[in-house]
C-alpha cells in the first residue's frame, strides 16, 4: 500500500468511488484497491 496515494484518491471522486466499492466488496477490484483492502488497518 506504500504506492497508493490516499490524498489523491480522497480528492478525486472518479478514483474514490471504485476504491469504496472494492472495500465494500461491491465492485471490480483494481490492483491498488485490492492491495489497500488487504492492508487497510495498517494504512489508516
Curated annotation (Swiss-Prot):
InterPro entries referenced in this protein's UniProt entry, alphabetically: A10/PebIII, OS_D_A10/PebIII_sf
Primary location recorded for the protein, binned into one broad class: secreted
Alphabetical GO biological process terms: defense response to bacterium
Name this polypeptide is given: Viresin
Keywords (A to Z) from UniProt: Antibiotic, Antimicrobial, Secreted
Subcellular location: Secreted
Name of one Pfam family that matches: OS-D
GO cellular component: extracellular region
Sequence similarity: Belongs to the insect A10/OS-D protein family.
Entry function: Has antibacterial activity against the Gram-negative bacteria E.coli and E.cloacae, but not against the Gram-negative bacteria P.aeruginosa, P.vulgaris, K.pneumoniae and S.enteritidis or the Gram-positive bacteria S.aureus, S.epidermidis and S.salivarius.
Amino acid at each position: 500500500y506504500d504506492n497508493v496515494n490516499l490524498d489523491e484518491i480522497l480528492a478525486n471522486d472518479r478514483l474514490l468511488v471504485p476504491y469504496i466499492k472494492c472495500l465494500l466488496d461491491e465492485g471490480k477490484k483494481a490492483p491498488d484497491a485490492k492491495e489497500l483492502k488487504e492492508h487497510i488497518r495498517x494504512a489508516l
